Amino acid sequence: MYKLNYTKENDFSKHLKFRLNHTKFPHAPLKGVSFEYGFNIDYLKKIRSYWLNNYDWNARLTFLNSLPHFKTIVSGLDIHFIHAKPAASAKNLKVIPILLIHGWPGSIREFYELIPLLITPRKNVDYVFEVVAPSLPGFGYSEAAAIPDWPLPKSKFYVSGGNWGFKIGRDMAIAYPENVLGFHSTMCMDVHLAPVPVAWTAVNVWIGSFIPGFAVAKEDEYRLYPLRDYTNWLWTETGYLHLQATKPDTIGTALLDSPIGLAAYLMDKFSSLTNPANRKLPDGGLTKKFTLDALLDNVMIYWTTDSILTAVRLYSEYLSNDYIKLKFDAAPVKVPTACARFPYELVYSPDFRVNRKFKNLVRISKYNDGGLYAAFEEPKIVANDIWTSIPLFLEARQNASSGSS
């Protein structure tokens, strides 16, 4: 294991500016159209101008280096991770190890506002967190896997994640229930596609369209109904998923060679998948939750490491027959689980499906704002949810131990 520092690369910055200055933009957008057709071209030109004239890569590198970076070998791969230990004032507190797992099109940048909220002690709380946040294989500074592997963890820890962090964390909880002490997620869902659970859910949801409260609680009805609106939104916003699952190297190659194309493709998701209403806004609502610096930090992590192609391959690997044969989607999660539910998750599973999947569900909390990238969008809310979940995890483990003795 060794420490990694992002380094300042003047030649690289000059090359990037040359590419940005010679961007070939398409024709102007349709009149009266904002983000309905994808990233708005007029706003993309403003992004390019900010990137060229206001975004200071060297200053951002200093910011990225404000958290300690390391690399280590895991299953033969060079894996990059942040390892943030508690503040010095926490010396008499119990240290809780937690693994934060990012998703796509995010990166470790998603956690920069969250991590300080976890490693800083809270008044009248007898524990604090030690955080490990890896770059997934093929993302950022982590080496891509030629053949997917499942390394056996040797320690015990808690896991938190949304987006791909949910799916990977869920699978870890199923595969290694003795190592994963508790699973916290901002995107709990049951994606078991076997005929019986799918048919049962379909019937419940269909009846719920006629009888309010049948399939979902009244306060959650807007998540599914009207069904036509929900279905249309899913079709509109999941095209990238099918493309990356079937032709990852094609889209990866296209994005690898165009910084402005990469920015548009990544930032589009931070617009539409944080709130569907953002499609109607000329700036895609991007600066409602994020700064342009934060969004460009994320783009730069992909651009400087040439990792977009290997990152999108994750979709193909997880939808492959080899992965499906592992039957993680069908297996129950038995470790203590806490679900933080946000209104604009990409895929909504009714609570009865969530309870079916997670057999030791200690908490479901519901919030009024936020989408697929909750830790990046709402770090304070996610931090509070994690802090609140730990005592419930400990209690569930203690009750399980008492019951088995």
Predicted regions and their residues:
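Non-catalytic accessory segments flanking enzyme active sites
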Residues: 13-87, 294, 303-306, 310-325
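Glycine-rich "HGGG/HGxG" loop immediately N-terminal to the catalytic nucleophile
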Residues: 57-59, 124, 136-152, 170
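Beta-sheet entry/capping signal
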Residues: 79-81, 96-99, 128-132, 155-159, ...
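Conserved HGGG/HGGXW glycine-rich cap/lid loop of the alpha/beta-hydrolase fold
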Residues: 91-143, 390
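Conserved hydrolase catalytic core segment
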Residues: 117, 121-126, 155-220
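Alpha/beta-hydrolase-fold enzymes
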Residues: 207-265
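C-terminal subdomain of alpha/beta-hydrolase-fold enzymes, centered on the catalytic histidine
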Residues: 244-405
